[in-house]
């Protein structure tokens, strides 16, 4: 598996998590529809699935990890930023095979791709505090 396959999986998972947050549809249905509608060539589909289902399953727990470091209530955080924070926090807390710096750098790149202009700074600041709270470097 190449790093680019995981990067593409994160990219797709961010979109799918966003869709799940907005629609509250069944995660399995979102996964299947995503595979039909999107070009998944070069995507680590197992990793995509793990991220999507992992975030959905552990959503409340993930929110509790990063919410204390937000500058505003969780309900006021942009849905794209929330999807990225949930995905990265999942990697930081549930994926020992992903170095913390990789999880943060990938989240920053996702924010640059999908979110508002300065979202990458917001995401970086929150996740830096998450790492410190988890005693990871």
Curated annotation (Swiss-Prot):
Q: Which GO terms describe its molecular function?
A: RNA binding
Checking InterPro entries in the record gives:
NusB-like_sf, NusB_fam, NusB_RsmB_TIM44
Which GO biological process entries does UniProt record here? Answer: DNA-templated transcription termination; transcription antitermination
- Superkingdom of the organism of origin: Bacteria
UniProt keyword annotation of Transferase present:
no
Which key words tag this protein in UniProt? Answer: RNA-binding, Transcription, Transcription antitermination, Transcription regulation
What GO cellular component term, any one, is given?
A: cytosol
Family of the protein in this entry: Belongs to the NusB family.
Protein known as: Transcription antitermination protein NusB
| Gene for this chain | nusB
